[in-house]
Amino acid sequence: KHHDGFAMYDSKSNDFNIVKASPFARDPMKELAQACKEEGLGFGFYYSHNQDWTFPGGNGGPTTTEDGKEVSFDYYFKNKCLPQVKEITTEYGDIDFVWFDTPGEMEKKYVEELVAVVRKNQPKAMISGRAGHGLGDYQSLG
């Protein structure tokens, strides 16, 4: 999922994804995970955890739900971000990394929870330093 909120996998927690909201209607990440496994290649996910321009409460997104209710980042985190990170760390077999991106001013408690989910579900996976608050396994430029 990039900042636009569109998941390039079959997300059960949000319908704005390649299977349910596009004519492609297949899960390319499932196919890629299988192909990487067959060829002995590492596999992982990119996930923009702070920004979501289309989901209420996501950084850069709407501040109200469709029915006009004001929401905070916590709403986005609990209803989209956390469920999707659980999905990508449980539905695709062993993964080698999760590349979080653009933490911005995301509170440390949220980053800690995401890191804990990855560590629990994929204990061998590396986490990018762009998770935020120095909680990743490696640093990257950009």
Predicted segment positions?
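Mature catalytic domains of secreted/periplasmic carbohydrate-active enzymes
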Residues: 1-142
